[in-house]
Amino acid sequence: MNFLNFSILIFAYLLGSINSAIIVCYIFRLPSPRSVGSGNPGTTNVLRIGGKVPAAITLIFDILKGLVPVVIAKVLTGNEFITACTALYAILGHIFPIFFGFKGGKGIATLVGTLFGFSWILGLIFVITWLCVAIITRYSSLSALVATFIASFSVIFTSDLQVAAPFLIIAIIILVKHKGNIQRLISGQESKIGDKAKAKNDSN
């Protein structure tokens, strides 16, 4: 691995480590997303805590955290594998941020950015899948999980297995991060889209 590739991966991780949910809630003088609602510093919890505007800002920044480094890797290296690894590092930064004690969000919005940066078709697959599942079930977590796996496995059909591997690793990490959501989905206790923040309970 040359210096350029290494630098891009480090940049992706550090950018991913900037937790926009925590920063946005601080700017809007809202409770910390780590102590209210689900306790998850992500877009869905910010929506429950502060409404549409703070959530939209959080969503946009989280998407850009994935999009920007992947596009940079794509343009500067022209290497699909390095670009896919850049996506993985951006997700790792978001989920395990060095600036916030390695306790971050669940990576969905940042994944959307990486997918659009890697291939707009993959990004579109994610968005369409998420919307379809969300409209039918109103479960944000279920929509995210289904869309994540469909989009990640779709990489296999557009690139070789080596390139797809980082996205499959991302899917597994996101699945593990949603363990609590999966348990509540099974028990029928998972929060639905539109539910207001209550006591901290680890939902998405």
From Swiss-Prot:
Any keyword Lipid biosynthesis? yes
- EC number(s) per entry: 2.3.1.275
Q: Where are the transmembrane segments?
A: 8-28, 53-73, 81-101, 116-136, 155-175
**What molecular functions are annotated in GO for this chain?**
acyl-phosphate glycerol-3-phosphate acyltransferase activity
Q: Which reaction does it catalyse?
A: an acyl phosphate + sn-glycerol 3-phosphate = a 1-acyl-sn-glycero-3-phosphate + phosphate
InterPro entries the record matches: G3P_acylTferase_PlsY (IPR003811)
Query: According to Swiss-Prot or TrEMBL, what is its membrane topology?
Result: Multi-pass membrane protein
Q: Where is this gene product found?
A: Cell inner membrane
Q: In its UniProt record, which GO terms are filed under biological process?
A: phospholipid biosynthetic process
Q: In which pathway does it act?
A: Lipid metabolism; phospholipid metabolism
What does the entry list under GO cellular component? Answer: plasma membrane
Tell me the keywords, alphabetical order.
Cell inner membrane, Cell membrane, Lipid biosynthesis, Lipid metabolism, Membrane, Phospholipid biosynthesis, Phospholipid metabolism, Transferase, Transmembrane, Transmembrane helix
Q: Quaternary form?
A: Probably interacts with PlsX.
- Describe the task this protein carries out: Catalyzes the transfer of an acyl group from acyl-phosphate (acyl-PO(4)) to glycerol-3-phosphate (G3P) to form lysophosphatidic acid (LPA). This enzyme utilizes acyl-phosphate as fatty acyl donor, but not acyl-CoA or acyl-ACP.
* PANTHER family (UniProt xref): GLYCEROL-3-PHOSPHATE ACYLTRANSFERASE-RELATED, INNER MEMBRANE PROTEIN YGIH
Protein family membership = Belongs to the PlsY family.
The name this protein carries in UniProt is Glycerol-3-phosphate acyltransferase
Species of the source: Francisella tularensis subsp. mediasiatica (strain FSC147)
